[in-house]
């Protein structure tokens, strides 16, 4: 599917049918999503595919988001790794000499952790939010490309997600992404004309 067509086809899917979503399709979409760029190639994301605990997770969603999560066959909880130094070292460890030169291994094992050590709390938060947004957009496009609907949800109680899903506290919940099929005819949302958002200097 051409990129323009793919973007025009993607809409927020808020009501789902009972049609199950194949776990292989979800895995494929996540694999494609991780081709997204990330600052320093740090890839600080973690995906939790929720099926069995969807009802419990839905209770943490605010307002109409409760219905969306409750009815979705699958919800993907997107987390980011707040221990950026550990994440950098993991990339070096998992990638190893087969994928990295000695210089690159040094970068992930020592240089990058030293860089992250200089970040204050706000810088870490901004860094994680940016990278989460990049991979989340790739994920919904990858799902759309397979004919699967999705919606990005920000309104939920982030303070309780780790406990409900049994995820280590070092991982920060960013988004819930509901996933499934719909029989609704979805219409595009209004977009500002491009000249309204461009300035030239």
Q: Where in this protein do the model-derived segments appear?
A:
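Acidic, surface-exposed loops and disordered segments
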Residues: 1-201
């Amino acid at each position: 599917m051409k990129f323009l067509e793919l973007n025009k086809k993607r809409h927020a899917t808020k009501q789902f049918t009972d049609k199950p979503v194949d776990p292989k399709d979800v895995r494929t979409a996540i694999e494609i999503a991780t081709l997204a760029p990330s600052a320093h190639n740090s890839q600080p994301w973690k995906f939790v595919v929720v099926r069995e605990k969807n009802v419990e997770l839905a209770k943490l969603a605010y307002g109409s988001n409760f219905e969306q999560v409750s009815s979705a066959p699958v919800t993907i909880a997107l987390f980011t790794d707040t221990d950026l130094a550990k994440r950098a070292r993991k990339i070096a460890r998992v990638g190893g000499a087969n994928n990295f030169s000695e210089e690159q291994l040094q970068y992930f094992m020592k240089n990058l952790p030293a860089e992250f050590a200089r970040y204050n709390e706000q810088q870490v938060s901004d860094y994680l939010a940016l990278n989460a947004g990049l991979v989340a957009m790739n994920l919904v496009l990858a799902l759309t490309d397979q004919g699967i609907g999705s919606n990005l949800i920000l309104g939920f109680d982030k303070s309780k997600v780790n406990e409900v899903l049994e995820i280590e506290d070092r991982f920060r919940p960013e988004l819930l992404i509901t996933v499934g099929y719909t029989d609704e005819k979805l219409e595009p949302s209004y977009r500002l004309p491009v000249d309204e958002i461009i300035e030239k200097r």
